[in-house]
Regions:
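Leucine-rich repeat
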Residues: 1-25, 37-112, 130-163
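A generic structural motif
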Residues: 124-130
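Structural alpha-beta junctions
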Residues: 64, 116-123
Length: 163
């Protein structure tokens, strides 16, 4: 059964647990989603027990009308994608709000992944409310800076030293 839900915006004071398989179920149930915000301003010092990965983010972006996404993801590993998944592109998404999403060095891999699958992306703000105080915010600031640089010069050329 599918529904015509176009916008989901949930902001609560506690972390929300969600995994990639549940993202698949959401996309199947709500294929008309245009905007998906699930605690995009999360400011806790600990992530939920389970988070969608970059693969889950990509699956969410399959909704043909999706243009805004904000949620906490686990970006510590670049996922292995199926052939079909590796072809997914969403050109409508320009901003991706990642809250206090876990991420590790080298962040260039995350920036490459995001720009490969979201070629119109111009910004990836981390948690804007306490930038610098959250464990991952400074790494997301680097990803955001790399994406802005790539957009400005039309190139994905970075070295590990850029980090």
């Amino acid at each position: 059964m599918t529904f015509n839900l176009r916008k989901l915006d949930i902001n609560i004071k506690n972390p929300i647990t969600l995994n990639d398989e549940e993202i698949v179920q959401l996309v199947q149930a709500w294929p008309e989603l245009e905007s998906f915000y699930l605690n995009p301003f999360a400011a806790w010092d600990y992530p939920p027990l389970q988070l969608p990965t970059l693969r889950g983010l990509l699956l969410l972006a399959q909704c043909p009308r999706m243009h805004d996404i904000g949620l906490c993801i686990d970006a510590r590993n670049i996922p292995s994608l199926s052939e079909d998944e590796s072809l997914i592109r969403n050109t409508a998404i320009t901003n991706l709000m990642v809250a206090n999403s876990p991420i590790e060095r080298p962040v260039t891999r995350v920036a490459h992944f995001l720009l490969e699958h979201f070629p119109s992306l111009v910004a990836v703000p981390g948690c804007p409310c306490i930038v610098g105080q959250m464990p991952y915010s400074w790494l997301w600031m680097k990803v955001d800076r790399m994406i802005k640089q790539a957009v400005g010069r039309g190139s994905l050329e970075w070295s590990e030293e850029t980090e």
